[in-house]
Regions:
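Solvent-exposed alpha-helices and their adjacent loops that cap or buttress functional pockets
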Residues: 24-26, 91-94, 125-128, 159-163
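Fold-independent oxyanion-binding glycine-rich loops
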Residues: 36, 44, 104-105, 136-139, ...
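Glycine-rich loop-to-alpha-helix module at the N-terminal edge of alpha/beta enzyme cores
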Residues: 40-126, 132
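PLP-dependent aminotransferase-class I/II
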Residues: 136-169
C-alpha cells in the first residue's frame, strides 16, 4: 500500500482523536524518524515525550529485549526485581520517600491529583475545605476527566464539561 492508501485505511478504522500530520513513519534511529518513503525527520516531540531516549539505541534495545525475554508487565500486585531497583533509584535521585509507578502519563496525572487531595484530607481533615487544585492556563495534561479538569485550554475542556470540581486556574 502507498502512504496515502495506508493513511486512508487508518482513517477508515481508527477513531479520530487528534489532527494528524500527513506522514506515516516506518522506523526510528536515535533521535530521527523515517517515513515509509525514506524521508528523515528530527523528532522534536520525542513521541509526545514518551520516547525521550530515542529509537533503536543499542543499549536500550538490548535491555528491552532482555526484559521481554524474562517478563513483561505484571501490574503492581506482585513484586519483581526491575521495579524494586527502579524504585530505589527514583527515591535516591528525588529525595522522596517512595516511588509510584503507573502505566501512562494519564495515570500519573490522576495519581498526582488523588495524592494531593488525600494529603490535604489526611493533614487537615474534610471540614477544612482544603481540596482545591491550582492549575495553569494554556496547559494540557491528558484526556481523562481528571486530566481535562486541570487542562487550562478551553477547547479541550468544553466538550466534556462538567468536569471534576475544585480546580482553580
Amino acid at each position: 500500500m502507498s502512504m496515502n492508501e495506508q493513511m486512508n485505511h487508518a482513517e477508515e478504522n481508527i477513531l479520530h482523536t487528534y489532527n494528524r500530520f500527513p506522514v506515516m513513519f516506518d522506523h526510528g534511529e536515535g533521535c530521527y524518524l523515517y517515513d515509509t518513503e525514506g524521508k528523515k525527520y528530527l523528532d522534536f516531540a520525542a513521541g509526545i515525550a514518551v520516547n525521550s531516549l530515542g529509537y533503536h539505541y543499542p543499549g536500550y534495545d538490548e535491555a528491552l529485549k532482555s526484559q521481554i525475554d524474562k517478563l513483561t508487565h505484571i501490574s503492581n500486585l506482585y513484586y519483581n526485581e526491575p521495579m524494586s531497583e527502579a524504585g530505589e533509584k527514583l527515591v535516591k535521585a528525588s529525595g522522596l520517600s517512595k516511588a509510584f509507578f503507573t502505566n501512562s502519563g494519564t495515570e500519573a496525572i490522576e495519581g498526582a491529583l488523588k495524592a494531593a487531595r488525600k494529603y490535604a484530607y489526611t493533614k487537615y481533615g474534610k471540614e477544612a475545605g482544603k481540596y482545591e487544585i491550582i492549575a495553569m492556563n494554556h496547559s494540557f495534561h491528558g484526556r481523562s476527566m481528571g486530566a481535562l479538569s486541570v487542562t487550562g485550554t478551553e477547547h479541550y475542556r468544553e466538550p466534556f464539561e462538567p468536569l471534576v470540581g475544585g480546580v482553580k486556574f
